[in-house]
Curated annotation (Swiss-Prot):
InterPro entries: GmhA/DiaA, Phosphoheptose_Isoase, SIS_dom, SIS_dom_sf, SIS_GmhA/DiaA_subfam. It comes from Pelobacter propionicus (strain DSM 2379 / NBRC 103807 / OttBd1). Homotetramer. The gene is gmhA. One of its GO terms (molecular function) is carbohydrate derivative binding. Disulfide bonds: none annotated. Residues 34-189 form the SIS domain. It is found in: Cytoplasm. This is Phosphoheptose isomerase. GO terms for cellular component: cytoplasm.
Amino acid sequence: MLDDITTQLKSRRALFELIARDMPPLMADMAAQLVEAFRKGNKLLVMGNGGSAADAQHLAAEIVGRFKMERRALPAISLSTDSSILTALGNDYGFDAVFRRQVEALAQAGDVVLGISTSGNSPNVRSALQLARERGCRTMGLLGRDGGSIRSLCDLALVVPSLDTPTIQEGHITIIHIVCDLVEKALFA
């Protein structure tokens, strides 16, 4: 059991060393684009499925509430959290449309629409990002593996290069926390 723990921790360390080496410019770009959008009065729409839905909800909560510093609220909406909307849209339009329909209702040009997908291939995230691009939104992805089919729909894609879903999710939440910190410092420090 202890060997398994050590192996898993070494694997995580290697991934975080890779993130530390390759992703700081991408995280800085993500934060800068969010800061610009918030300064212009735009909002963040964020979505994902399963654990990525939890990450989307977590990110929206940090942006609307606060991350580390007391400050004014910023506009962010998780498209993964309203069970009535999700089940109505899933029932009436199919699960592939649950995020797209919300983007249709809520997104305006200049908004940031962020899709979180450990596979990079979630059809409902892909469909929503496609519509967001057509509407003049900035599209971003927090993705895993090789970025999948969603990568090409993103103006900015941060890809955690692992095949292990829990490890990808750990990378995503770390990136989310760093970006939240950068956004707060840029807008309120």
